[in-house]
Amino acid sequence: MANVYSRKKRIAHEIQKKINISLQHNIRDPRLRKTTISWVSVSHDLGSATVFVIFNGIQNDNQTSEEIKKRIKTLQAASGFIRYLLGKTMHLRIVPKLTFVYDQSLSHGIYIHELVNKIIREDHKSLIKNGIVN
């Protein structure tokens, strides 16, 4: 039976921590100041990692999708330096190739939350209109 917290998961978690620290202390690009690594997925051979990012202060709508694409490109351009920093701090034979992807789960969760609140308000208005609730 596989270990509950496998080596792959431990490495992914460690990569997440190290990149978050690097973004705070080693990357000086102002466009990446409010970047958070939400999670990392590592391939089975540990040769590549998909890094899911959230940009604080940006919500996913038509106006900001271009800004998100620009920031992802900036992160991808810095991926060599980030890999170098990972190689210095992590003891791995091969440092995974990094691919940065925007994590839409937060904006999707906010959207779902707004829909639920809208439905609750409409139900409450309907109940008041029908005299069921004051």
UniProtKB/Swiss-Prot annotation:
Family annotation (InterPro entries): KH_dom-like_a/b, RbfA, RbfA_dom_sf, Ribosome-bd_factorA_CS
Cytoplasm is among the record's keywords: yes
One GO CC term on file: cytosol
UniProt-listed GO biological process terms: maturation of SSU-rRNA
Membrane among keywords: no
Primary localization: cytoplasm
Subcellular location, record wording: Cytoplasm
GO molecular function: ribosomal small subunit binding
NCBIfam families: rbfA
Subunit field text: Monomer. Binds 30S ribosomal subunits, but not 50S ribosomal subunits or 70S ribosomes.
Family classification: Belongs to the RbfA family.
Function, as annotated: One of several proteins that assist in the late maturation steps of the functional core of the 30S ribosomal subunit. Associates with free 30S ribosomal subunits (but not with 30S subunits that are part of 70S ribosomes or polysomes). Required for efficient processing of 16S rRNA. May interact with the 5'-terminal helix region of 16S rRNA.
Name the record gives this protein: Ribosome-binding factor A
